[in-house]
Amino acid sequence: MKQLLLDIQPTAVPTLDNYVAGRNAEALHSLQLAASGTTDARFIYLWGAGGGGKTHLLQASAALARQHNLALVTADDVHALSEQQQIALFNTYNQLREGSGVLIACGSAAPNQMGLRDDLATRLAWGLVYQLHSLS
């Protein structure tokens, strides 16, 4: 009997280097700068259909920020936040704006197209907003 060798590798840890950018190169570059603290852009919102890598980019940005000892807050699936969670994110945004740190958030649609509280949608749209495109 011959033993078969299966080529099974563990899932790669999300990094900005292993994200396949495709048409999302500008968004990726902005995240690299923000998560390393080398830009004035401190608020980034990513949106698009599932499978575009939003969660990968959030996790990778958080890891890079830790390497640079940068305070970074991420918010995934903003479109699914409850009223209380939206208020908490709004307050977090304002605290970061008055102090230091970076906020990267993502959702399924542009900030003003998700039925979020008006104050939160406005804040999310104040920063850099990128629609992520899936690879074809």
Question: Model-predicted segments: where are they?
Answer:
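Dynamic helix-loop-helix/coil hinge segments at AAA+ ATPase domain boundaries and subdomain interfaces
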Residues: 6-28
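Interdomain "pre-motor" coupling segment immediately N-terminal to P-loop NTPase/helicase cores
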Residues: 1-5
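P-loop NTPase Walker A phosphate-binding motif
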Residues: 55-68
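Short regulatory helix/loop adjacent to the ATP-binding pocket of P-loop NTPases
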Residues: 111-125
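Conserved P-loop NTPase "ATPase switch" module shared by AAA+ and STAND
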Residues: 69-88, 92-95, 99-109
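Walker A/P-loop nucleotide-binding motif
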Residues: 40-57
